[in-house]
Amino acid sequence: MLSRLFTVPAILLATLGSAATLAPREESACQRVCCDALVQSTSRGLVGINCNRGGIDCGFSGQIASCCAAIVPVGARQGTGVQCQRGN
C-alpha cells in the first residue's frame, strides 16, 4: 500500500525530468511586426508600442520594423510587442 503512494510521484518526476533536458527554444523565433516606437523594458529586451503583425513595408506607414516574441493581448493583430528587437 505504501509503495503505491510513491509510484505515481516517481513516474511524474521522471516525466518532468526528461522535459527539463529538452533543447531551449530558439531566440530567433519571433514575429515580424511594425511598431510606432521601441522602448527599453524592465526585463530583457524592448517593448513595442502600437505594433501591427506582418512587418511588411513599415517605413511607408512611418513605423519601425522589428521582431517581437509576442503581441499582447494574445490573438490580437495590433497591440504591445513583448521582447522585441530592431529589424527583422
Swiss-Prot record:
Disulfide bonds join 30-67, 34-58, 35-51, 68-84. It is found in: Secreted; Secreted, Cell wall; Vacuole; Cytoplasmic vesicle. Residues 1-21 form the signal peptide. The keyword Nucleotidyltransferase does not apply. Induction: Under normal conditions on SDAY medium (Sabouraud dextrose agar plus 1% yeast extract), hyd1F is transcriptionally active during the first days and sharply down-regulated from day 3 onwards, leading to a 99.7 % reduction of its expression level on day 7. Hyd1A is the most active at transcription level under normal culture conditions, followed by hyd1B, hyd1E, hyd2A and hyd2C in order. Aerial growth, conidiation, and dispersal of filamentous fungi in the environment rely upon a capability of their secreting small amphipathic proteins called hydrophobins (HPBs) with low sequence identity. Class I can self-assemble into an outermost layer of rodlet bundles on aerial cell surfaces, conferring cellular hydrophobicity that supports fungal growth, development and dispersal; whereas Class II form highly ordered films at water-air interfaces through intermolecular interactions but contribute nothing to the rodlet structure. Belongs to the fungal hydrophobin family. This is Class I hydrophobin F.
